[in-house]
């Protein structure tokens, strides 16, 4: 079965794994998925990133983070914003602040995939891929 939207698939896999309190989840690898995972790690939402396999069967394994004695997921919610049927682009001033700055918007810019904070610092806009908080 082909996957038409790998970013939505990634967000769904992370959401499902964190709800079931799994320690990790695997996702089919691509450069975009790896870039998004690196932003999530930099922002403190996931613990680690490991690449497994080569070529067509390569996968990215993400270590999920939990907090507290009851293991509450660090990621409370993930929302896809720009979809294949409706792309959403914002300039620097139009980039949203997710939950008043507590969350992060992941933006695909001409200088790569980055958080909304980094895009604002560099003064560039781009395609808003998703919100994470």
Curated annotation (Swiss-Prot):
Q: Which GO terms describe its molecular function?
A: rRNA binding; structural constituent of ribosome
Q: How does it assemble?
A: Part of the 30S ribosomal subunit. Contacts proteins S5 and S12.
The protein's job, in short, is: One of the primary rRNA binding proteins, it binds directly to 16S rRNA central domain where it helps coordinate assembly of the platform of the 30S subunit.
* Family membership noted in the UniProt record: Belongs to the universal ribosomal protein uS8 family.
Alphabetized UniProt keyword annotations: Ribonucleoprotein, Ribosomal protein, RNA-binding, rRNA-binding
Under the heading InterPro entries, the entry gives:
Ribosomal_uS8 (IPR000630), Ribosomal_uS8_CS (IPR047863), Ribosomal_uS8_sf (IPR035987)
Organism of provenance: Prochlorococcus marinus (strain MIT 9515)
Write the lineage as a comma-separated list.
Answer: Bacteria, Bacillati, Cyanobacteriota, Cyanophyceae, Synechococcales
Keyword Ribosomal protein (UniProt)? yes
Gene Ontology, cellular component aspect = ribonucleoprotein complex; ribosome
| Gene Ontology biological process | translation
Asked if the keyword Zinc belongs to this entry, the reply reads: no
Q: What is this protein called?
A: Small ribosomal subunit protein uS8
């Amino acid at each position: 079965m082909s996957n038409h939207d790998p970013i939505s698939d990634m967000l769904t896999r992370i959401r499902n794994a964190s709800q079931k309190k799994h320690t990790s989840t695997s996702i089919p690898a691509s450069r975009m998925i790896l870039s998004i995972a690196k932003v999530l790690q930099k922002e403190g939402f996931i613990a680690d990133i490991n690449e497994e396999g080569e070529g067509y069967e390569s996968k990215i394994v993400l270590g999920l983070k939990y907090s507290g004695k009851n293991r509450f997921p660090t990621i409370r919610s993930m929302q896809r914003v720009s979809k294949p049927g409706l792309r959403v682009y914002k300039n620097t001033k139009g980039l949203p602040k997710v939950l008043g700055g507590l969350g992060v918007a992941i933006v695909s810019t001409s200088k790569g995939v980055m958080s909304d904070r980094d895009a604002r610092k560099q003064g560039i806009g781009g395609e808003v891929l998703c919100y994470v908080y």
